[in-house]
Amino acid sequence: MNKNPIYRSEEEAKDIACGNVAAELDENSQALDAINGAGWKQTIVCTIAQGTVGCLVSYGLGNGGYCCTYTVECSKTCNK
């Protein structure tokens, strides 16, 4: 008999109060895949929407349209 409850067979899982742990983990992973695996089209749309919202918020906060990063070269020009 295997002591790890995840690797127990169905016969050995009958005496466990929580049931078959491996089947429950498989169901959970399938549910997460369904939630996270919405498809590449939705991912692209979400990325574009988030970028657009980020640009609008940045413009609303006073960014004059310059794209600045945290690099050393750009930090000097952004502080002007």
Swiss-Prot record:
Could you tell me where this protein is found in the cell?
Answer: Secreted
- Residues with 2,3-didehydrobutyrine modification: T43, T47
Q: Does the keyword Secreted apply?
A: yes
- Which GO molecular-function terms appear in the entry? lipid binding; signaling receptor binding
> Which keywords describe this protein according to UniProt?
Antibiotic, Antimicrobial, Bacteriocin, Lantibiotic, Lipid-binding, Secreted, Thioether bond
Name a single GO biological process: defense response to bacterium
Protein modification: The lanthionine formed by Ser-58 and Cys-68 forms a putative lipid II binding motif. Maturation of FlvA1 peptides involves the enzymatic conversion of Thr, and Ser into dehydrated AA and the formation of thioether bonds with cysteines. Modifications are processed by the flavecin synthetase FlvM1. This is followed by membrane translocation and cleavage of the modified precursor.
One GO term describing the cellular component: extracellular region
Task: State whether keyword Iron applies.
Answer: no
Propeptide segments, given as residue ranges? 1-38
Q: Where is this cross-link: Lanthionine (Ser-Cys)?
A: S58-C68
Write out the function statement from the record: Lanthionine-containing peptide antibiotic (lantibiotic) only active on Gram-positive bacteria in synergy with Flvbeta peptides, which are encoded by the same operon than Flvalpha.a. Shows antibacterial activity in synergy with Flvbeta.b, Flvbeta.c, Flvbeta.e and Flvbeta.g. Does not show antibacterial activity when tested with Flvbeta.a, Flvbeta.d, Flvbeta.f and Flvbeta.h. The bactericidal activity of lantibiotics is based on depolarization of energized bacterial cytoplasmic membranes, initiated by the formation of aqueous transmembrane pores.
The entry's protein name is Lantibiotic Flvalpha.a
